[in-house]
């Protein structure tokens, strides 16, 4: 039976335990996701408490991380999503995403509406990918793809 969570703390505690196990075992998120049939970004989001894993994937991930049965069950429960503190992020990486939306949020909104009409980009029917590519000017660049289904606003 599908279960739901109403408290974010239990999943945040599980995420801390998962990250500790991941570090002890020297596993990457890609290695943990391997064999689940799910995208690395989706499995990572589940491990960090923002998505629910199907039972088979939760068991596979649980075995790789030596999680107990309760933790494997928690990974399958629908989490309280978007439960990051309601304040400006202080972590430098997360702050840069916040900053990007502060600078480009209105641009993204204007372009989405111009190209699609009044509506939103779904975060439910959504895919995320992060790639590291060489920068022709030296160093490396991050290519982040946000791929969400467009959902038009419908008058009623």
From Swiss-Prot:
Homodecamer composed of five homodimers. The keyword Lyase applies. Coiled coil: none annotated. This is Cyanate hydratase. One of its GO terms (biological process) is cyanate catabolic process. Keywords: Lyase. PANTHER family: CYANATE HYDRATASE (PTHR34186:SF2). Catalyzes the reaction of cyanate with bicarbonate to produce ammonia and carbon dioxide.
